[in-house]
Amino acid sequence: MRYITIALAKGRLAKKAMEIFEQIGIPCEEMKDEKTRKLIFTNEELGFRFFLSKPSDVPTYVEYGAADIGIVGKDTILEEGRSLYEVYDLQMGKCRMCVCGPESAREKLQHHELIRVASKYPNIAKDYFNNIKHQTVEIIKLNGSVELAPIVGLAEVIVDIVETGATLRENGLEVLEEVCPLSARMVVNQVSMKMEQERINKLINDVKKYIETQGR
């Protein structure tokens, strides 16, 4: 029996995902050792392998078949644009991708003015403004605190993930438009879905049943 390999986005998401896998009967004791230097963790008995990855790399591992399954945020899936199957919304880590800025920028958005948009997610921002709003904008990619951009005059608005909106309010910014809702998703390699259909479908269905039970 070949291993089913699962790539997990590092952080809270990986921890929550492993709790779900344990609840559906796929534990991995090796992962509970926080001092371990191992990169790959296995459940030999059931034939599963797990590894932790930077979130933006998870779709790449899945597309190229280095992982059969990935657990990663919808924001990363949209930004990376990889060829894979998105099979289930895990309903964890819910938040929104939004266009944010000072109130004064609202009119510029409404009038489709040429503006600068700063974001850690340039592909999502480009798709939203080009294909949904049909507004010509200049996209500026940032890696740090994008909230700074409108404050220091780098851009009129930002496209970023919003959870509570507290950081925005503290900096005199607000949500001006919602781009899309976000949450953690399960993704599957296209070839693996055909080759290991029975085992992967069982895993998907077991996860679905568990999450639906929790939601009641």
From Swiss-Prot:
Gene3D superfamilies membership: Periplasmic binding protein-like II
Keyword Cell inner membrane among record annotations: no
Cited PROSITE patterns: ATP_P_PHORIBOSYLTR (PS01316)
Swiss-Prot/TrEMBL keywords: Amino-acid biosynthesis, ATP-binding, Cytoplasm, Glycosyltransferase, Histidine biosynthesis, Nucleotide-binding, Transferase
Coiled-coil annotated spans: none
HAMAP family, A to Z: HisG_Short (MF_01018)
Name of the protein described by the UniProt record: ATP phosphoribosyltransferase
Originating organism: Lachnospira eligens (strain ATCC 27750 / DSM 3376 / VPI C15-48 / C15-B4) (Eubacterium eligens)
Encoding gene, per UniProt annotation: hisG
